[in-house]
């Protein structure tokens, strides 16, 4: 869906298809992940005895994964929504959403917005539509940005299932990746 929106709306967000690799040191765990992937309909996922970044460990190969710049995508998506007559309300705290023939959104300031559709995008649900909200814990993520010689690492996505997990992606720069 994201790829179709990028193409239709001509959003410049560095969208590209790349290979993905789930890295692992435990072959049994990777085999279980492979079975789960296949049961979920991801039949193109393959087991590889050698990962591209560590020939001593195996990996699962996920073809045709998507990679894009999320902020550029969201900026382009917002422009497309506004161009088509949509409205985006930022820094607006919502306390209630009622769905009937139309959607009525009520803000903390008491303002009501009536519309055909509303997107509620939050990190945690604030509406009482779910009987149980699972435990939410605070987590930290650390990001490293490194310059590497262009072409020195195959443009792919790499991740593992360790705790904490590791995730690597290569992004193009002017003189380095």
Which ranges hold each PLM region?
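Active-site substrate-recognition segment that forms the wall
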Residues: 1, 8-16, 94-96, 102, ...
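Flavin (FAD/FMN) cofactor-binding and adjacent substrate-gating region
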Residues: 1-76
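Hydrophobic helix-cap positions at the C-terminus of alpha-helices
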Residues: 5, 37, 80-81, 171, ...
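A generic structural signal for short, solvent-exposed coil/turn residues
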Residues: 15, 54, 80, 86-88, ...
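Fold-independent oxyanion-binding glycine-rich loops
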Residues: 26, 50, 64-65, 91-92, ...
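Helical element adjacent to the flavin cofactor pocket in flavoenzyme catalytic cores
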Residues: 36-37, 59-117
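Glycine-rich loops and low-complexity Gly/Arg-rich segments
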Residues: 41-46, 70-71, 85-87, 142-146, ...
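General beta-strand structural signal in soluble alpha/beta enzymes
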Residues: 45-49, 88-90, 120, 159
């Amino acid at each position: 869906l994201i790829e179709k929106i990028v193409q239709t709306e001509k959003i410049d967000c560095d969208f590209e298809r790349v290979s993905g690799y789930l890295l692992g040191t435990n072959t049994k765990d990777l085999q279980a992940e492979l079975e789960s992937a296949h049961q979920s309909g991801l039949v193109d996922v393959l087991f590889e005895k050698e990962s591209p970044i560590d020939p001593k460990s195996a990996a699962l190969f996920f073809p045709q994964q998507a990679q894009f710049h999320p902020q550029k995508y969201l900026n382009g998506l917002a422009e497309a929504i506004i161009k088509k007559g949509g409205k985006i309300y930022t820094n607006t705290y919502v306390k209630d959403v009622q769905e009937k023939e139309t959607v009525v959104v009520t803000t903390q300031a008491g303002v009501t917005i009536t519309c055909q559709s509303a997107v509620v995008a939050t990190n945690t649900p604030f509406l009482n539509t779910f009987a149980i909200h699972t435990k939410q814990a605070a987590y930290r993520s650390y990001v490293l940005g490194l310059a590497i010689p262009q072409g020195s690492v195959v443009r792919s996505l790499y991740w593992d299932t360790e705790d904490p997990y590791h995730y690597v992606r290569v992004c193009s720069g002017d003189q380095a990746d």
